[in-house]
């Protein structure tokens, strides 16, 4: 039996036409269709022409959003020695060595980002069962295996976000809040597009970008004209 749409969602769907919108027009519409009683998240869902079952067609990287994400991010750091104090002073929410690894093994997952120093990675590798399914296993490519924990903590707290293509070659990324100005959402979406283009897998063949949709977390999907987004030049303000 089909699920009955709420009146709120029906009214939002009526505003969206079956076509690809210019980027700023799409983001303005995203804001108009964010009608829930809370500040909805702005989401991007991007289908790429890759098959991640092949290692040379996998995409995993990070994006730094110039306008932030509007979210408070809890960062955990697994390290040892003097780096423990560095991580604590740099604003990490959870810091530890063996004891933090044990807590995670027992099911403690009270964080959105996990950073580890290289010396701890052999022990962190034991957490594959807990971290892998959630996409939280630290990796050098994701910027979460590093000796410079202070810089990494600051970057993720400021809105840096790790993402990857799923098994179907689709990227799902949160790039702001519906309360952001449409122009600020556009700056973030452009940063995401440029990051995906810069990190095109070497094995990707044919048309790389298949489609891109944006939406508020409780709103309808809105197709974006990908060529218009890629051709867009945003002048940096001094």
Curated annotation (Swiss-Prot):
GO BP annotations listed: regulation of translation; translation
Keyword rRNA-binding: yes
One Pfam short name: Ribosomal_L1
Any one annotated GO CC term: large ribosomal subunit
Any GO MF annotation of the entry: tRNA binding
Keyword flag tRNA-binding: yes
Role: Binds directly to 23S rRNA. The L1 stalk is quite mobile in the ribosome, and is involved in E site tRNA release.
Quaternary structure, from the entry: Part of the 50S ribosomal subunit.
Family listed: Belongs to the universal ribosomal protein uL1 family.
Protein name: Large ribosomal subunit protein uL1
Organism of origin: Picosynechococcus sp. (strain ATCC 27264 / PCC 7002 / PR-6) (Agmenellum quadruplicatum)
Gene that produces this protein: rplA
């Amino acid at each position: 039996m089909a699920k009955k749409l709420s009146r709120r969602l029906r009214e939002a769907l009526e505003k969206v036409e079956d076509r690809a919108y210019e980027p700023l027009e799409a983001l303005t519409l995203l804001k108009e269709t964010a009608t829930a009683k809370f500040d909805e998240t702005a989401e991007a869902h991007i289908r790429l022409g890759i098959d991640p079952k092949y290692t040379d067609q996998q995409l995993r990287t990070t994006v730094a959003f110039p306008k932030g994400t509007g979210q408070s991010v809890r960062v955990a750091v697994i390290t040892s020695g003097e780096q423990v104090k560095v991580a604590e002073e740099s604003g990490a929410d959870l810091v530890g060595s063996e004891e933090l690894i044990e807590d995670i093994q027992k099911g403690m997952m009270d964080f959105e980002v996990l950073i580890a120093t290289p010396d701890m990675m052999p022990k962190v590798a034991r957490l594959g069962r807990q971290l892998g399914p959630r996409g939280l296993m630290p990796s050098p490519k994701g910027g979460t295996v590093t000796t410079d924990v202070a810089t990494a903590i600051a970057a993720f707290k400021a809105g840096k976000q790790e993402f990857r293509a799923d098994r179907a070659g689709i990227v799902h990324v949160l790039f702001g809040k519906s309360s952001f100005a449409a122009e600020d959402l556009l700056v973030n979406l452009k940063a995401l597009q440029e990051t995906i283009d810069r990190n095109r897998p070497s094995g990707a063949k044919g048309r790389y970008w298949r489609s891109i949709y944006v939406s508020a977390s409780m709103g309808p999907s809105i197709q974006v004209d990908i060529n218009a987004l890629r051709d867009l030049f945003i002048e940096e303000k001094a």
